[in-house]
Regions:
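Conserved short "hinge" loops at termini or chain/domain junctions
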Residues: 1-65, 121-140
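Short alpha-helix boundary/capping motifs
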Residues: 37-38, 70, 101-102
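Ordered, amphipathic secondary-structure segments that act as subunit-interaction surfaces
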Residues: 48, 52, 64-84
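Short loop/turn elements at secondary-structure junctions
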Residues: 75-140
Length: 140
């Protein structure tokens, strides 16, 4: 399941701009395959960072990951042309910075966060309180 959809991208971009970024043959329509490829590339980039700490791809996509998937996919679409506008480049750089911090463990993705203490295969042992201590047996 992709982290973002074409509808998510259209929430951020006007359809006219999306047509300009995807329509190489001048048909006047959004080319779905180009959008799908940009999203897949964004997902792969996110998985590359998050895969160091999380099981990827995510079954349930955290909202922040969806947001950054959209930002990265839009940046990828602009990269096919002359380059991204300054605000889109800044959003992309912020996404990469965030994902770098996630991979280093400095930022948590919330409920999907891996346990900070790895499970052990060692048995757990509990003892009752001691009846005789060293001080009790000192003069014995």
């Amino acid at each position: 399941m992709p982290y973002a959809t074409q509808a998510d991208i259209l929430d951020q971009l006007d359809e006219d701009i999306l047509i300009q970024l995807t329509d190489d043959a001048d048909t006047g329509d959004v080319v779905d395959d180009v959008v799908t490829r940009a999203i897949a590339d964004a997902d792969a980039e996110i998985d590359g960072y998050c895969g160091k700490r999380y099981s990827v791809p995510f079954d349930t996509v955290p909202p922040i990951i969806r947001k950054f998937a959209v930002d990265i996919a839009i940046y990828n679409l602009y990269a096919r042309r002359k380059g991204a506008p300054e605000d889109r480049e800044k959003r992309y750089n912020n996404a990469v910075k965030f994902l770098t911090n996630v991979s280093k463990g400095l930022i948590s993705l919330g409920e999907n966060d891996p346990d900070s203490t790895p499970a052990s295969n060692a048995p757990e042992i509990e003892n009752e309180d001691r009846i005789f201590t060293r001080t009790d047996l000192e003069d014995f």
